[in-house]
């Protein structure tokens, strides 16, 4: 049993916004893999909850008219890992979220929840920073988009204003085309553990594959929010692809 004051079930994004405005202290819940655990521990006891789990309009992955990859905020980790668009263009994200918890968590946990909780150790967080992701937010005043590095404000806090809801994460075509990368997770255990630190790197090579044309390096748990490593990126850009440069 969970100690909650009330549970409201949103029927649409607009209805979720209306519920948020009517109940400003309520907690949004989707998969519930974080919120319900916190409630069980008494940290959110007596809270009102707004469930958005039934909103299929913000679930799924597609390429938009500009060939940007659009990931609905209710898309689960398992769906992301298996999705052919992810596998073809940004498989590093699929690999990263496949390291979250166990199969049960990945089957119900969502990319939106993983980013909206503002936790720097989230496996998706550093990976999305390395993809120059854009966060789409829908609220009373319409839709706004901002770079993911601006979405994270401080530890446990993201840029969601009263009545707003994260509805998608977008990877622009120019952010993924020609890039390849890897995500490395360090943790106390090999599985079922949060990251002690996480590092995601995406590299774009020259046509002859001998020079680093561009690189993005992002870390989780290196600070209160996920962060890029601009000095390391600048040092590597334009350099030959050698062990000396990589190390």
Residue ranges of each PLM-predicted region?
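C-terminal structural segment of proteins
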Residues: 1-247
